[in-house]
Amino acid sequence: MKKSKAKYLTLAGVVLSAGLLLGACGNSTSSSKVYNYVYASDPSSLNYLLENRATTGDVATNLVDGLMENDQYGNYIPSLAEDWTVSKDGLTYTYKLRKDAKWYTADGEEYAPVTAQDFVTGLKYAADKKSEALYLVQDSVAGLDDYINGKTTDFSTVGVKAIDDQTVQYTLAKPEPYWNSKTTATILFPVNADFLNSQGDDFGKVDPANLLYNGPFILKSFTSKSVMEYKK
């Protein structure tokens, strides 16, 4: 995310036909100043780690990036990850993070680098708070089901590790050739521990100041049932 650009994205809370919606989506270009997108209802929360509603995910994925994302054709491409390897047995996925990935505040100020530990923090928080999206990964990540069900209280036994600041590793309970697709789910997105702790229960409330941003946009303002404005 670069603070120098002043591009805005406005979401108008009105109902249009599918044709108009697709037209609006197709007209967004790098040179456009305003992008209108139709949404059915206000997000009740932007806590991307706990919520599993489309109203949350559709907004949050414009603000926060994960390891992988979909391109315009639906292919999985790197986002915060710049490269990854898979072990021969298909159980261990190791991701190298981009060194230029940063967290920014709602004011556009640099807060901290995005690190591998942010992914560990995110999954632990999701497990501790019983995220609505746990079903997506509970049986996938080694040891996660035991942690969620209280068979262990030691999160270090769960198959997500920060090998170093730029390397995060997932160990799976069984091979999943489609694992990379799951990294686009917001439950596997990172979160900065210091910011999360400072926010407490306010983290992810629908207010620009209650999130950190590492994605394409910063939430500039929100008016219920009217406008959500993004700044790039």
Identify the residue ranges that each predicted region occupies:
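Bacterial Sec-dependent N-terminal signal peptides
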Residues: 1-10
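Bacterial N-terminal signal peptides
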Residues: 12-20
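C-terminal motif of bacterial Sec signal peptides marking the signal peptidase cleavage site
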Residues: 22-24
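Bacterial signal peptide processing site
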Residues: 26-28
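Short, well-ordered beta-strand elements
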Residues: 32-41, 92-96, 119-122, 168-169, ...
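N-terminal lobe/hinge region of extracytoplasmic solute-binding protein
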Residues: 38-88, 212
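Aromatic- and charge-enriched surface segment that lines or borders ligand/interaction sites
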Residues: 82-133
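Gly/Pro-rich hinge or "lid" segments in bacterial periplasmic/extracellular proteins
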Residues: 166, 172-232
